[in-house]
From Swiss-Prot:
Similarity remark: Belongs to the UPF0114 family.
Membrane topology: Multi-pass membrane protein
Provenance organism: Buchnera aphidicola subsp. Geoica urticularia
Pfam families: UPF0114 (PF03350)
InterPro entries for the chain: UPF0114, UPF0114_bac
Protein name, per record: UPF0114 protein in repA1-repA2 intergenic region
């Protein structure tokens, strides 16, 4: 009975597969949004203010950071929880694939969230004259919370690696 339960639990990891497929579709949608932003800015580029262009570029950077986060979560999650990817090492395999454990994924996700939050905050500061001080204050507080959380997770990871060594 115990062996059967273990086989069922082990096989249930495949239930995550549709989640990773869904993230792939999310990545496609994000890519479409990226190109939509570029297409919309092209006709306006010569009449657009410098700060307006910077806001668009920050938006593109934001989309790129979220896309990178999605790719990292999809690939490393699939490899850690479902199955190893059998990719020809000489040609296509990314250098970090197969080397990230759950803790390093968490730290990279936290770092990505801080970077994304930083871009949002910078975009907010570019339009600070149109935004209430309360909203700016709360955005800064939330950003600092992300920073402290990422720092705390990195410290805990470093301490746990020291204790296992």
């Amino acid at each position: 009975m115990e062996k059967l339960i273990e086989k069922i639990i082990y096989a249930s990891r495949w239930l995550m597969f549709p989640v990773y497929i869904g993230l792939s579709f999310g990545f496609i949608l994000l890519t479409l949004k990226f190109f939509q932003q570029i297409i919309l800015v092209i006709p306006k580029i010569l009449i657009m203010s410098e700060s307006g262009l910077i806001l668009i570029v920050l938006s593109l950077i934001d989309i790129a950071l979220v896309g990178g986060l999605l790719v990292m979560v999809m690939f490393s999650g699939y490899e850690n929880f479902i199955s190893k990817m059998e990719i020809n090492v000489d040609k296509k395999k990314l250098g970090w694939m197969g080397t990230m454990d759950v803790n390093s994924i968490k730290n990279k996700v936290a770092s990505s969230i801080v970077a994304i939050s930083s871009v949002h905050l910078l975009r907010l500061f570019m339009d600070a004259d149109k935004i209430s001080n309360d909203k700016i204050m709360w955005c800064v507080i939330i950003h600092l919370t992300f920073v402290l959380s990422a720092f705390g997770m990195a410290c805990i990871d470093k301490m746990s690696k020291k204790n296992y060594s």
